[in-house]
Amino acid sequence: MSNKAEKYSQLRSMIPEMRRVKHIYFVGIGGAGMGGIAEVLVNEGYKLSGSDIAESAVTQRLAQLGATIYIGHDASQVKGMDVVVVSTAISADNPELVAAKELRIPVVRRAEMLAELMRYRHGVAVAGTHGKTTTTSLIASIYGEAERDPTFVIGGLLNSAGTNARLGHSRYLIAEADESDASFLHLQPMVSVVTNIEADHMDTYEGDLEKLKTTFVDFLHNLPFYGVAVVCIDDPIVRELIPRIGRRIVTYGFSDDADVQALDFKQTGYSCEFTVKRAGLADLRLSVNLPGEHNVLNALAAIAVATEDDIEDAAIIKALAEFQGIGRRFQQIGEFATSKGEIKLVDDYGHHPSEVAATIKAARLGWPERRLVMIYQPHRYSRTRDLYEDFVEVLSQVDCLLMLDVYAAGEAPIPGADSRALCRSIRVRGQVEPVFVASTEQLETILPEILQGGDLLLTQGAGSIGLLSRSLTESNLGFAATGKDEKNA
């Protein structure tokens, strides 16, 4: 164990029973959520190993920190482990999972390990269908600016830290709470945030929206009676659930009855300016270095959490104004000089209709003079099926649409819930003429024909499209070399 890890091994001192655990194995270690927890544990001084199907920036970073990384899953790799951590993406027949059970090695889900990290810390858990990563990142940034030195585990790359996880040396732990498999019920934080609730991951909830709602209420009731629930009152389902929440509540939003309210919103390019009204406190006029009303809501959640913890306004204002963003959350890749003129490239992770709509609205507000060209990759056949008409409506709002095939994420195809079907339905709607693109390689031929000078090109989705911005950068958006002028934001 390094001197740093020995000095600050808080988990072992807080949970003596964890001293028995020497070697931890992660199956699917390259995922953002898994990799973040793994990074905190390896920095705590635990011996750590893990596997994934491919090398990634996450696995490379963990290897540099001292973890043993295997590419590919093999039963022999879990021998001698004290505990095996698995993500929900790991199938029951995974050879490492099967071997762990045969060897009677404890198998825990990612959220259970996160719960152990949080057990004796002051935990802030951020849940909701949309906005978790951004909100968690904003809270972590404010606490960092206030010199609270938090530990954080985030589902995306926090640009200012160069990582999605960090071991702090204080009592604070700030983390995303994942409702996709209801595993957030393992967490027992001091502060819980709910950004919004929509029908998503409905297979977990047997297609029952009421079951989803009840699970969120149960999550909030994991708070101690002296904890606080910070919830977005603008969201209709959250507002509906407030009478069922038996904990102290702080609401936020644009609504007049919000405890922490945003007023006088204005977006200029990438940043938003607004006034924050809080009961019994002076109003704040501030800006957040993120676009869109949805990001103002995310900022309000962070402000509410920080205000509850008596963080000074100066730290809040500075952290939000200087926020450097998160990977793949309206990430400005650059501006490119082409034979057609300058074109701006933005990459975004949103893959639910509401997220896509918020991204489109932010782009329209920030750059109203630009034509909006979207390359979209649907994520999961089941989501496409369940939200089909919503996708048709929101994707019809761009000026030009290029549609990649569905990223299956392990699912079998569902007839009528694929990209070709979406293109047909969008075409019938008549607002935009979509172009189906069978492979990303075709984009180098298609883009120079479609793009115009001044366009905003948006790559959108949660699957393999996340790698597209790099290849587009290398090929200058498919144009022949014309003096690329990349300005990373």
UniProtKB/Swiss-Prot annotation:
Record Pfam families: Mur_ligase, Mur_ligase_C, Mur_ligase_M
Subcellular location(s) per record: Cytoplasm
Keywords: ATP-binding, Cell cycle, Cell division, Cell shape, Cell wall biogenesis/degradation, Cytoplasm, Ligase, Nucleotide-binding, Peptidoglycan synthesis
GO term, biological process aspect, one: peptidoglycan biosynthetic process
Annotated catalysed reactions: UDP-N-acetyl-alpha-D-muramate + L-alanine + ATP = UDP-N-acetyl-alpha-D-muramoyl-L-alanine + ADP + phosphate + H(+)
EC number: 6.3.2.8
A single cellular component GO annotation: cytoplasm
Protein's name according to its UniProt entry: UDP-N-acetylmuramate--L-alanine ligase
